[in-house]
Structure formats: C-alpha cells, structure tokens
Amino acid sequence: MTNVIEMMTSLYPVSDDTIQLLKDNVTLCHFPKKYQLIKANQYSRSAYFIEKGMTRSYWLVNGEEITTSFSCEGGIVFSMDELYYNKMSEEFVETLEDVVAYKIALSDLIRLF
C-alpha cells in the first residue's frame, strides 16, 4: 500500500493506528486493462485505492462516452451516487491499464472514517 499511504499522508495527518485499521480492512486485487470496476445502474458496494495503474470515470450519454475524471496511483475510486445518496451509480469506472488496487467495502470505509 506504499503509494496509497504516501498520498494519504501527504494530504492529511494520518496516525499509524489508522493506517493499520485501513490495512486490516482491504483486499489486494489485480485488474486487467479495460476492466469495469464500477458499472452504471448497479451497486458496487466497494471503493478501490489505486496502488498501481490508472482508471477513467465516464458517463454514457446517447451512446457516447463522456469522461468525467481520471484516478491514478495513490487515488481512490468509488460511486459517489452510492456513497452519498445510497443509489446506483450513474457512472462507469474502467481501468486504462493493468491495475493493482486495494478494495474496501463502502460500509467499512464509512465506519473507519
């Protein structure tokens, strides 16, 4: 979790105990290029801390992909619709290259932070 922890601690004061709690609640995952981490009109129930690689978030509007953001090493991706409004995602999130990420249940993320 080197890149994730470095990004977090560069932005916020994070205790060693908090980092350990996070480590205890994540699962290491490997995703191939073009993998759909999050799909529109579905619940994901998870957030992903990106250790290595890059993702793209986008909407599908009249058959056209509209990119809304990119996330890279040290970043986090999740469905804001799901986390904040408890509704299915309106966005897709796909990997732009092979990605190593740490997956955490949204319920655990809320509980921890």
Where are these regions (language model features)?
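Glycine- and acidic-residue-biased ligand/ion/polar-headgroup-sensing regions
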Residues: 34, 45-56, 73-74
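Compact nucleic-acid interaction/catalytic patches
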Residues: 59, 64-67
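Short phosphate-coordinating micro-motif centered on Lys-Gly-acidic
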Residues: 37-42
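Cyclic nucleotide-binding regulatory module and flanking cytosolic helices
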Residues: 1-28, 82
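Cyclic-nucleotide recognition modules
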Residues: 66-113
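Short beta-strand segments in beta-sandwich/barrel cores
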Residues: 27, 36, 54-59, 76, ...
